[in-house]
Each structure stands twice: as structure tokens, then as C-alpha cells.
A protein has these predicted regions:
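Gly/His-enriched, cation/cofactor- and phosphate-binding structural elements
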Residues: 1-87
Length: 87
């Protein structure tokens, strides 16, 4: 399932105009987040705010004991914070 999230994030980057993609997948009580970037947005910095890590254009995080909607809200906040600080 986590591999599917990574593939989904990769696939979303092929959509015209998409600079970064985030895919979420819940397994048991953990939400797995896979992120990819075209190189203009540092997804590593965004997912570090959720306890994850990786590389500038490819990163991941696991949010334990969370619903998908709660993890998504937290992710949106991290993205908004990143954009306010960096763009």
C-alpha cells in the first residue's frame, strides 16, 4: 500500500502545472504520506514538520495514531507554513 502512495505521488507530477504532489495512505492506525516535487518545492522541509524526512524532491512521513483527515489537516498547515516562508 505504501508503494502505491509513492507511485500515486509520482504520477500526480505528470499533471500539467503540478509542482509538488502528496499522497496519503492509512494502514491500521498510521497515515503514510509520500511526497514528490518537480524541484521547485522542498518536500523534505514540509514533511520534516510531520516527523518525516527524505530529499528535496522526494520525501515521506508516517503519522501514527491519526485519522486521514487529521493528518491531511496537519499536512495542509505544514504546506501553508512552507509557502509563507519560502515563496
Amino acid at each position: 500500500m505504501r508503494v502505491s502512495a509513492a507511485k500515486a505521488a509520482d504520477r500526480l507530477l505528470s499533471v500539467e502545472g503540478v509542482q509538488a504532489a502528496f499522497a496519503l495512505c492509512r494502514i491500521d492506525d498510521t497515515v503514510h504520506i509520500s511526497a514528490r516535487s518537480q524541484g521547485t518545492i522542498n518536500v523534505q522541509l514540509i514533511l520534516e514538520k510531520l516527523g518525516g524526512g527524505g530529499h528535496f524532491d522526494s520525501a515521506g512521513a508516517q503519522v501514527k495514531n491519526s485519522s486521514t483527515s487529521t493528518a491531511l489537516t496537519t499536512l495542509r498547515s505544514a504546506i501553508d507554513e512552507y509557502l509563507a516562508e519560502n515563496l
